[in-house]
Amino acid sequence: MRPPHVPEVALHLADEAHDLWHRTEEELSEIGLPPPFWAFAWAGGQGLARYVLDHPKTVAGKRVLDFASGSGLVAIAAMKAGAANLTGADIDPFCETAIRLNAEANAVEVGFLGADQVGRDDGWDVVLAGDVCYEKPFADRLVPWFEALRSRGADVLVGDPGRSYLPKDRLQKLATYEVPVTRALEDAEVKRTTVWRFA
């Protein structure tokens, strides 16, 4: 499948979002596993991937971390835009396979880190994060880390479809997109998604 806002990228995604999401979420919760966030191209990731493809200088020739990578959509877009080195990071172990398969489908290489990266600094030039401010405790952990990365010179970009815990007072708006989404997942057919830079 090709996400509607980023048709340049081919992904292995769930095509029946509603049934898969609800059935899998219930079944996996019984055995203590997380929902399959990696099986969908979320609006924040689509907006961020679109921005990177439209503004390749953001990543061209740079070492990039795609944080909370999920399917690898943003990572793949960054590689297509000319990133020198790309690492996708996600704590869901299923993401490693999803990212590998999706990278292969797009003829790019994406490394993978499965450990929690919050607080870590491997000297990335750019950190990309799509749709990560959906819960307050998680956003509260991310903001100091993103600010520390920014203060030492990294470019930190976040794609966000209007989640409640985005710290807009610390951000610079770069672009806004109307991203087609699945109503079963987002309760809408289009999500206004903004790409922000930590200032």
Question: What do these predicted ranges mean?
Answer:
Residues 1-199:
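S-adenosylmethionine-dependent methyltransferases
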